[in-house]
């Protein structure tokens, strides 16, 4: 079972860039591992650090600004997560501590992979995202509340509605990954298997 996602309130960091691809999110040299942990250290590695080893932080990159330390909501521009289909991209984001990414649009494969890894991708209109960038710029350190049950983002004195399809919403609200979803039907699967001839078991 994965962690349930119902509602999250967190610090917002504004990444004011469109077409952020998966190679920028987690560069290919860090993909050797097959477990989901440890990738956060290399998130946006080529942007966060001035050296290849990731030991010299880039003071001009927004994730390194002290006011955004501990951010758990990433605000981005259109076509976030484009490029190759590596599942390591949402792994890196969640391992770093992000729970939500808000953007006008996402690459399709990244969008699906995010739900599989309990990272909530929230689509809002370009105009709404513009408003949120302006709000964060004027109020560094602001927190947003993201409510998956009500499908709204509360930011400042405004509320923004978003839509997640019923199946994905059900899975996230109940902490169901593909294994957990299968286990929901364990008794039905067992009953089906019992009906099969012995040579097919």
From Swiss-Prot:
Annotated organism of origin: Citrobacter koseri (strain ATCC BAA-895 / CDC 4225-83 / SGSC4696)
Signal sequence, renumbered to the chain: none
Catalytic function, reaction form: (2R,3S)-3-isopropylmalate = (2S)-2-isopropylmalate
NCBIfam families: leuD, PRK01641.1
Family label: Belongs to the LeuD family. LeuD type 1 subfamily.
Entry EC no(s): 4.2.1.33
A Pfam family it matches: Aconitase_C
Assigned keywords, A-Z: Amino-acid biosynthesis, Branched-chain amino acid biosynthesis, Leucine biosynthesis, Lyase
HAMAP family given in the database record: LeuD_type1 (MF_01031)
Assembly and binders: Heterodimer of LeuC and LeuD.
Function summary: Catalyzes the isomerization between 2-isopropylmalate and 3-isopropylmalate, via the formation of 2-isopropylmaleate.
Single GO molecular function: 3-isopropylmalate dehydratase activity
Protein name, entry field: 3-isopropylmalate dehydratase small subunit
């Amino acid at each position: 079972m994965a962690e349930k996602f119902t509602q999250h309130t967190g610090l917002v960091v504004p990444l004011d860039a469109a077409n952020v691809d998966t190679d920028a999110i987690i560069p290919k040299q860090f993909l050797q591992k097959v477990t989901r942990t440890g990738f956060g250290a290399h998130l946006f590695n080529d942007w966060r650090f001035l050296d290849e080893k990731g030991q010299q932080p880039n003071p001009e990159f927004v994730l390194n600004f002290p006011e955004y330390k501990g951010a758990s909501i990433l605000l981005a521009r259109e076509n976030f997560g484009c490029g190759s289909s590596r599942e390591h991209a949402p792994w890196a984001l969640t391992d770093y501590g992000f729970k939500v990414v808000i953007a006008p649009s996402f690459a399709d494969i990244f969008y699906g992979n995010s739900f599989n890894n309990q990272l909530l991708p929230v689509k809002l209109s370009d105009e709404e995202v513009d408003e949120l960038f302006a709000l964060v710029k004027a109020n560094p350190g602001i927190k947003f509340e993201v409510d998956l049950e009500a499908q709204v983002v509360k930011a400042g004195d405004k509320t923004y509605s978003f839509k997640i399809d019923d199946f994905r919403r059900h899975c996230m609200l109940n902490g169901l990954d593909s294994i957990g979803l299968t286990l929901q039907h364990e008794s039905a699967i067992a009953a089906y298997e019992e009906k099969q001839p012995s040579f097919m078991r």
